[in-house]
Design a protein with these regions (language model features):
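Short loop/turn motifs that connect adjacent beta-strands in outer-membrane beta-barrel proteins
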Residues: 38-48, 89, 94-100, 145-163, ...
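Surface-exposed strand-loop-strand hairpins of Gram-negative outer-membrane beta-barrel proteins
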Residues: 58-83, 127
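Detector for outer-membrane/organellar transmembrane beta-barrel domains
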Residues: 179-309, 316-317, 328, 365
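Surface-exposed loop and membrane-interface regions of Gram-negative outer-membrane beta-barrel proteins
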Residues: 75, 99-179, 298, 341, ...
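Cleavable N-terminal export/targeting peptides
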Residues: 1-45
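Outer-membrane beta-barrel translocator domains and adjoining extracellular loop/strand segments
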Residues: 62-71, 110-118, 175-179, 213-221, ...
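Transmembrane beta-strands of outer-membrane beta-barrel pores
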Residues: 54-60, 103-107, 166-174, 204-212, ...
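Outer-membrane beta-barrel "beta-signal"
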Residues: 359-373
Length: 373
């Protein structure tokens, strides 16, 4: 809970528990009736924060989607993406809830169906398909031990609280792959305080994912395949349960002079363990660059610099209403795909040699503007 939230909650609790101490007993009360003021109720949500964002990723990627560079000198796996986002955050008596939904609109290097890759239809026929549209939603909820057990024993030094954490994710995209991600997480969160009203959270979790891959569908690029062994009956992939660690932090740059005290830094990182064969078909996996075994995925935004534009131009009363920001993103083994293997996806033959498609590890900058309402 933020400093502001704790201050508001403490003030309201002090009002709710206020008892006039100037009367020794009921016998001292005056003869006439005094109508007591109603005790204000605490709101169910102590904080509600809703925001919309538009941002742009110049060099995003989508694994397995790439085009040849001029002269067949290598592969271009970069995809520019426009991102439209809505986020909701709330604090209630026993914890927090976060929900976010994003729409990513790609350029032509990440095409929609029926193209199977940039500028290519099934059978190798040339075509120009529009950029794909992806929807991704994420939910995280925490339940604080201090609040559940009505204690402060889980706060010590910089440790602010320990919480149960549960979460879910969903994703779908209108490309040929036709992904349909459903993921679930459960574990603990350790919340630490940082200077200048900041925080640092670490959450070890169990992670389970289900997905879909149209390329694995029996009868689709799988002549002579064995259903359930070398092709998927319905294209569904049931990954093994694995481990995950999610980290996020935030801190105002409060050490700056008041005249320029409009900046904050934040970041996040998610580490997700291997979850079995990428296609759910281990009999198809080869060795070396032909392997389809998943690897540990690192999905991170190590640093984001935020400028509080509304505070700078309209004053402290309007802090955080309009912010602009820029961030650096690093995503290794995207979706768990081994960037050193996965022949035909993360690596492919060009000019007689196997070269990286540069689509399974993303290094990009993202810039955006966020409005709170």
């Amino acid at each position: 809970m933020s400093y502001r939230t704790k201050a508001v909650a403490a003030a309201m609790l002090s009002l709710a528990s206020f008892v006039p101490m100037s009367f020794a007993s009921a016998a001292d009360l005056p003869a006439y009736k005094v109508k007591a003021k109603p005790v204000p109720d605490l709101p169910f949500f102590l904080v509600i924060d809703d925001r919309v964002t538009f941002s742009y990723i110049g060099t995003g990627t989508d694994p397995g989607v790439f085009s040849a560079k001029p002269g067949n000198t290598g592969w271009n796996g970069n995809t520019a993406k426009s991102v439209y986002s809505f986020t909701h955050f709330d604090v209630w008596a026993y914890g927090t809830n976060f929900f976010g939904i994003n729409m990513f609109k790609s350029d032509h290097n990440d095409p929609t169906a029926p193209c199977i890759n940039a500028g290519v239809l099934p059978g190798g026929i040339a075509a120009s398909c529009s950029g794909a549209t992806e929807f991704f939603g994420l939910l995280r909820s925490t339940y604080g031990w201090n609040e559940i057990f009505n204690t402060k024993m889980f706060s010590y030094g910089p440790l602010h609280n320990i919480s149960f954490e549960i979460g879910a994710e969903g994703e779908a995209e209108n490309n040929y792959l036709a992904p349909n991600k459903r993921a679930f997480e459960a574990g603990l969160q350790f919340a630490f305080d940082l200077p200048y009203k900041g925080y640092f959270n670490v959450a070890p979790l169990a992670y389970k994912e289900l997905n879909h891959n149209a390329f694995n569908q029996c009868g689709n690029f799988t002549a002579g395949a064995i259903p359930g062994a070398t092709c998927s009956v319905d294209g569904e992939t049931n990954f093994k349960t694995t481990w995950a660690v999610e980290i996020n932090y935030y801190m105002d740059l409060g050490f700056l002079p008041e005249s320029v005290n409009y900046f904050a830094i934040s970041g996040r990182a998610g580490f997700y363990g291997p979850k079995g064969d990428a296609n759910g078909l281990p009999l198809n996996s080869g060795v070396g660059v032909a392997s389809t075994a998943t690897k540990t995925e690192i999905n991170s935004e190590p640093i984001r610099l935020t400028f509080d534009a509304s505070k700078a131009f309209w004053g402290p009363k309007y802090a955080q209403f309009v912010t602009t920001w820029v961030s650096y993103r690093y995503w290794e083994n995207k979706f768990g795909l081994d960037h050193n293997a996965e022949l035909g996806v993360c690596n492919a033959v060009i000019g007689g040699t196997v070269q990286s498609t540069h689509s399974c590890t993303e290094q990009s900058y993202q810039a955006g503007i966020t409005v709170k309402f």
